[in-house]
Every structure is written in structure tokens, then in C-alpha cells.
């Protein structure tokens, strides 16, 4: 190259013009820019040669002249001509087309236009080839989309800043949802989030100068007012729907406005019976009631009335399929997520006091020992007389209210029935149970005791389940029978060495196998029954609803709606959904239990050593007796099963499921590993 040649090269991502001064060695040249700054370059770095005869002082004027010619719109006109001709051009040819000459300024301007263009031309060697009409159309479309996305991104950031400054002041747009949902999924699934979601969420966090972590995403969603500080991540990780689809709500409304014809027109009128419904005060879905009467022959008959949602639901309709998808009503400390829309579940489906209700009634006569002597199952009409709480019934039984001999008779038969089941090998486990409620951000824990009222209701429900299973077995009816294999319990001598109460029950509980659902009747070990089927919660447990469909069809003399094969298929999907619901309930209760302890960090609790988790590591399961919470604790001293302790929370983090307990009289605070609650 000659001294004085004006060339273009790139430095730090920008064009630079410089004049060739001299060679530095065999491979490099020294060039000088308009600031008289020297640069050492390799000839391969030169991207355009303008020509000889220039000095560095002329560079600014040359650049100014070029700038006046840089009109990108002119390229479109040139492209239209060249694409029609199918001709490629170099900068000189483009200069001729655009400016009608090949002056250095215009040639360089043409070079700049062509090299910066990403739409109309594609470089191939030293020439530029016009793109096809379809290619240009596609690129324009892509550019429009990119511009729109950039605008949406900038608008989203603006709205995010506004929402952070004034929570609740922003009306989020549809275009915001993908980024916000990615942020939610990143906060929910953490390291397991989809990589695309993680990337989008991290871009938002980085733009707002926040840590690019799932925890920061959670905090941002709370700060934006989109999430609550105690957002239920377990529920969000599940497939459990929170809202009902419009079609399901529409059908519920339709059934309320125009009830369908009753398939059981010949319901038995049992409205003369006094019916007690017994539930917690917060219960809204009332699905069982109890009666007692003396027959003309002097025998006593118990009635267990179960709500009849099949009066309002048919197999395969929208309400049924949605209930099947949900599988169960979910009971969380913060409220319930029902299996059916609330307006119909707590309305005509429920056994509401004073109203004539449709039911499936189980009439049972027991032997003096408590075995089933005779039974009848009938679709019925009843009128619940009293809605009682467990506390109401306990008080009535304690005071011996003379005006309610029926409730006393039911309680008496409940005790007889319990003793009979014990004689049949039933295994009773009475562990303290915590009922955790959250109302207006206040967390309360109530310890549920095994009162007479709860025992009598449980016995009557078990009795109805035995009768339903007997009916199904007698008529070879496909039903979701529930069974439990016989456990291998520790030897009696070993159990007697353990302190009675929770410690001993905990040892027995650990040996109990899971109950199973099968189409074949089999023994249920812990209930002490040869056959059993759950039928007493059809509003809130789909497998119970299935049993109602089957039994009621058979009572009418019809073919059951589900064959054995169909029932098995439905039960498989329902069981998976029900297991997920149990997991969400357990984890949510665990979270709020830890949150309660966090808020009472200075309180002292009476603890009981239940059993060893890993004795060689001094890791045990302890029961906080006032709360019914079971937690892991590592000891730095020898302890015995059944030993009572005074405990305090040393550290708790509900969101990360970590709690450290310490003995008040022991100065050493032991760091505890994260251990899942064992229940």
C-alpha cells in the first residue's frame, strides 16, 4: 500500500478511517487517524480502501461529506431495481446507481450503506446480492416483531417500576403476562424451572438490579402485589386447579336454576326422623347425618344419612369430569379448594339444617355385641334437625340432655361398635392431631382431642363403609373397596417396654402399611373389618362419589355406569390426583406450623421424644405436646424414648423448611439437618 492511502478498519466495534503511514514489519502497517493517533494493523483488518493521496487532516471533511449521502431509504429503491434485474453490485456500481458517479466519497457512502444493511442485500465476497422479495418480506416481519418486543419490554419495565413504587396502581397488559408468568414459574420451581423461564426471569431481575435468584423472584412478586408474602408454592407446584372453568360454573348455575329430573323418584321419605349433622364449626360441605329409632318389634335401628350429589351430577357431565380431575376437596389452613363449585356443594348437595335434602341412607341393626345383624340402603329424603359441632355433642353427652335421647343412643352404639371392632383385631392409634387455621394473617393451632363425639361420628362412618362394602360384595358390584394388609407389629413385650400413649402409638404407626384401593373386597387390618368401602364423603372425595354411582344404579335395577375395567381406569387417575392433594395438604400444614413457631420464637414448649430417626446420629422425632407437631431434633446428650423436654425454637425458616430446636436447660445449640416431617 502507498503512503497516504485512506483506508477503513474496525476498532472496538466501530468504523475508523486512517491514512497509511509506513510498514512496521513484513506483516503490519502503521496507520494514523484524524487525531494523529497511530495504529498497528494487519492488512486483513482493512475492510475498505478508498484510495491514495490523503492526509490525516482531510479525514474529518471526508467523513462529513460521506454523512450527507447516508440515506438508508435509498437502498430500497436500488434493491427494487437490482432484484428485478437479478444483478449483484459492488460499492462502485451501487454508487453509480445511487449517485450517478464513482467519486471516492460516494463509493465509500455506498460501501457504508451496503455493509450496514441487513435487509435488502447479502454480501458474497466483494459484491452484494439482492435478497428475494419473499426474503425481504420475512426480514421486515421479523424486524417488526423484534421492535414490538423491545417496545413491550421497555413498557413492562416501566410498569414494573411503577408497581414497585405504588403497588396495586398498575393495570397489567396481556403482553406482560409471559414475562410475569416466567417470573412466577422461576420462583415456584427454582432450579427445576424451565431454562427459558429462568432466563426470562433473570433478565427482569437484572433489569431491576435485583439478585437473579428464585428467592429474589419470589420477593419481587410480593413487592409487585402479585403474590402474598406466604404464597403457597406447594399448591403452585401441583396440578391442582384453584379456579373452576366457566363451563363448569355455568352447569352448576344451570342445575341450581333448573334441577334435573331425579333418577330416584321413589325415594323413601325419612323426614320424620330426627337427624343430627355433626361437624367442625367451619365445615361448609355437610355430607353426613345420623339418626336413631326404635322399630315396632323393639329393635333399635341406626341411620347414617349420606349426602347424595348424584342427584345433581351424572357420570360424564361437566361437573363429574371436573370433580374427577380434582379428586378431592383440599383442606388447607388458609381455606378449602372444593371438588364441586361451592354454590352447589354447600347448597343443595349438603345436608343443611331445616331443609328437605336428598340422601343415600344406610339403616343398620346391630347385634348386642356390635356386629351388623341387618341393613338396608335406600335413596331418601331427610330433613336435618340439628347442626351440631363436636363440642356441642360432647357437652350434651356429658350433661345427659334428657330431650335428646337419640344422641345418647347413637353414642352408646358407637362405643359398642368400637369394642366389637377391637375384638375383631382393629388397631387403634390415638396420636395428637393439630388443626392449623390462618385467618386475617393470624395463625392458630388447635389440638384435636379424641372426644366421644369424634369417636361416635367415626364409628358411624366406618359402619356405613362396612355396609356399603357388604352390599357390593353380596351383589358382585364393582366398587372401590379399601383394604389394608395385616401389619407386622413389634412383639407385645417390646411394645410394653415403651411408655404408653404417643410413644407406643408412634411405634405401632410406623409398622402400619398403606391402605389400598381395589375392586376386590379384602380385609382392612386397622379397622378390623373383613370388607370396607369409603362412601361417606361423596361431596369431597371422588372415590366415594364413584361408589354412590354404582350402588344407586344397582338399587334401581340398572347396570352400574362403570364396568370393572372402566372403574379401575378412573381410579388410577383419581388416586394419583388424591396423592398429590395429600402431599400439598401435608406440606402446607408443615409450612404454617413452622410459621406459627417462628412467630412464637420465644415461647417454651413441652416436647416428648417419640422415636429415633437415626439413633447413631442422635437424631430423634419429638412431639410438641401442646401443638401436636412432630419435628426432628438432634441431641448432644443421651435421651430416652418418652423423655419429656422443655424446648425452644433456636432457628426456623418456613420457606426453606428448616427448623432447629434446642433444650432450654442445655446451652449447646445443635445445627439440625433438613428432615421431612414424619407423620
What are the residue ranges of the model-derived segments?
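Low-complexity, highly charged intrinsically disordered N-terminal segments
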Residues: 168-272
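Major-groove recognition helix of helix-turn-helix-like DNA-binding domains
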Residues: 108-113, 126-130
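Compositionally biased alpha-helical segments
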Residues: 50-61
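Short, amphipathic alpha-helical interaction segments positioned at domain boundaries
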Residues: 136-161
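Electropositive polyanion-binding surfaces
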Residues: 2-6, 10-16, 25-27, 35-37, ...
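Accessory beta->alpha helical hairpin/"wing" motif in late/C-terminal subdomains of nucleic-acid enzymes
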Residues: 124-140, 236
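A short, conserved structural fragment
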Residues: 115-127, 227
Amino acid at each position: 500500500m502507498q503512503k497516504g492511502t485512506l483506508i477503513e478498519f474496525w476498532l472496538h466495534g466501530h468504523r475508523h478511517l486512517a491514512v497509511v503511514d509506513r510498514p512496521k514489519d513484513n506483516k503490519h502497517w502503521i496507520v494514523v487517524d484524524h487525531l494523529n493517533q497511530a495504529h498497528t494493523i494487519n492488512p486483513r483488518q482493512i475492510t475498505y480502501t478508498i484510495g491514495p493521496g490523503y492526509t490525516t487532516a482531510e479525514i474529518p471533511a471526508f467523513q462529513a461529506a460521506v454523512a450527507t449521502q447516508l440515506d438508508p431509504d435509498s437502498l430500497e429503491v436500488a434493491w427494487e431495481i437490482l432484484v428485478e434485474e437479478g444483478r449483484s453490485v459492488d460499492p462502485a456500481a451501487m454508487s453509480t446507481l445511487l449517485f450517478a458517479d464513482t467519486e471516492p466519497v460516494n463509493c465509500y457512502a455506498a460501501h457504508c450503506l451496503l455493509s450496514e444493511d441487513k435487509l435488502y442485500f447479502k454480501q458474497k465476497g466483494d459484491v452484494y446480492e439482492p435478497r428475494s422479495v419473499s426474503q425481504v418480506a420475512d426480514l421486515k416481519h421479523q424486524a417488526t416483531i423484534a421492535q414490538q418486543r423491545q417496545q413491550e419490554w421497555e413498557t413492562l419495565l416501566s410498569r414494573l417500576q411503577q408497581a414497585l413504587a405504588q403497588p396495586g396502581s398498575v393495570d397489567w397488559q396481556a403482553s406482560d403476562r409471559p414475562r410475569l408468568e416466567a417470573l412466577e414459574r422461576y420462583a415456584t420451581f427454582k432450579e427445576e424451572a424451565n431454562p427459558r423461564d429462568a432466563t426470562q426471569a433473570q433478565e427482569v431481575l437484572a433489569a431491576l438490579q435485583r439478585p437473579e435468584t428464585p428467592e429474589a423472584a419470589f420477593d419481587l412478586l410480593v413487592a409487585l402485589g402479585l403474590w402474598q408474602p406466604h404464597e403457597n408454592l406447594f399448591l403452585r407446584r401441583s396440578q391442582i386447579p384453584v379456579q373452576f372453568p366457566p363451563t363448569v360454573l355455568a352447569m352448576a348455575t344451570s342445575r341450581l336454576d333448573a334441577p334435573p329430573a331425579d333418577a330416584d323418584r321413589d325415594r323413601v321419605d325419612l323426614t320424620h326422623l330426627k337427624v343430627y349433622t355433626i361437624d367442625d364449626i367451619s365445615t361448609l360441605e355437610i355430607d353426613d347425618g345420623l339418626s336413631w329409632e326404635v322399630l315396632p318389634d323393639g329393635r333399635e335401628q341406626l341411620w347414617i344419612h349420606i349426602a347424595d350429589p348424584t342427584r345433581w351430577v351424572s357420570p360424564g357431565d361437566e361437573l363429574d369430569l371436573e370433580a374427577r380431575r380434582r379428586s378431592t376437596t383440599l383442606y388447607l389452613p388458609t381455606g378449602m379448594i372444593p371438588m364441586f363449585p361451592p354454590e352447589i356443594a354447600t347448597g343443595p348437595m349438603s345436608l343443611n339444617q331445616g331443609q328437605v335434602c336428598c340422601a343415600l341412607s344406610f339403616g343398620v341393626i346391630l347385634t348386642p355385641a356390635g356386629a351388623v345383624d341387618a341393613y338396608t340402603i335406600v335413596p331418601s329424603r331427610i330433613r336435618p334437625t340439628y347442626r351440631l359441632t363436636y363440642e356441642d355433642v360432647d357437652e350434651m353427652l356429658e350433661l345427659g340432655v334428657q330431650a335428646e335421647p337419640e344422641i345418647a343412643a347413637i353414642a352408646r352404639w358407637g362405643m359398642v361398635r368400637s369394642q366389637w371392632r377391637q375384638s375383631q383385631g382393629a388397631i387403634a392409634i390415638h396420636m395428637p392431631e393439630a388443626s392449623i387455621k390462618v385467618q386475617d394473617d393470624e395463625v392458630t393451632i388447635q389440638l384435636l382431642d379424641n372426644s366421644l363425639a369424634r369417636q361416635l361420628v367415626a364409628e358411624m362412618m366406618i359402619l356405613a363403609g362396612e355396609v356399603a362394602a357388604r352390599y357390593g360384595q353380596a351383589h358382585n358390584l364393582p366398587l372401590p373397596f379399601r383394604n389394608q394388609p395385616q401389619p407386622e407389629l413389634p412383639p407385645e413385650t417390646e411394645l410394653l417396654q415403651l411408655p404408653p400413649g404417643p410413644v407406643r402409638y408412634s411405634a405401632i404407626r410406623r409398622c402400619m402399611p398403606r391402605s389400598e384401593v381395589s375392586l376386590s373386597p379384602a380385609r382392612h387390618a386397622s379397622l378390623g373389618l373383613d370388607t370396607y368401602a369409603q362412601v361417606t364423603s361423596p361431596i369431597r372425595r371422588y372415590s366415594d362419589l364413584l361408589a354412590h354411582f354404582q350402588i344407586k344404579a344397582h338399587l334401581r335395577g340398572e347396570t352400574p355406569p362403570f364396568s370393572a375395567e372402566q372403574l379401575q381406569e378412573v381410579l388410577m387417575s383419581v388416586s394419583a390426583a388424591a396423592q398429590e392433594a395429600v402431599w400439598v395438604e401435608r406440606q402446607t400444614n408443615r409450612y404454617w406450623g413452622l410459621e406459627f413457631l417462628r412467630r412464637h420464637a420465644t415461647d417454651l414448649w413441652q416436647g416428648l421424644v417419640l422415636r429415633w430417626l437415626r439413633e447413631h446420629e442422635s437424631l430423634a422425632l419429638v412431639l410438641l405436646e401442646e401443638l401436636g407437631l412432630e419435628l426432628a431434633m438432634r441431641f448432644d446428650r443421651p435421651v430416652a424414648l418418652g423423655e419429656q423436654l422443655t424446648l425452644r425454637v433456636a432457628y426456623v425458616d418456613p420457606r426453606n423448611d428448616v427448623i432447629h430446636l434446642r433444650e432450654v436447660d442445655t446451652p449447646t445449640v445443635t445445627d439440625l439437618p433438613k428432615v421431612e416431617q414424619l407423620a
